[in-house]
Amino acid sequence: MLCAVYKSSRKADTYLFVKKRDCFDDVPAPLMEMFGVPKLVMVFPIAKRDALGMADIQKVRAAMEENGFYLQIPPPQVNLLAEHKLSLGIKD
């Protein structure tokens, strides 16, 4: 199975994996609206890959089989100031 990866034009570090290039039929309309204009990053055969950058390859494969797409969002940012205050015993 081929996999096309698109970068969001609205959300930083957000990627959409779909089964076919330029085929977003399985992606819900509200998600596409939030995602913005998709910008193609790459197309590759997912069956031949053992790993992906930040995404778990098994989760990507499972989501694409079940839903027809996979949405990769960035991990939440760590609030270093809040962690520092907490380490000093300062509560907001």
Curated annotation (Swiss-Prot):
Gene3D superfamilies: YcgL domain. Pfam families: YcgL (PF05166). It comes from the Bacteria. Residues 1-85 form the YcgL domain. PANTHER family: PROTEIN YCGL. HAMAP family: UPF0745 (MF_01866). This is YcgL domain-containing protein Sbal_1869. The lineage of its organism: Bacteria, Pseudomonadati, Pseudomonadota, Gammaproteobacteria, Alteromonadales.
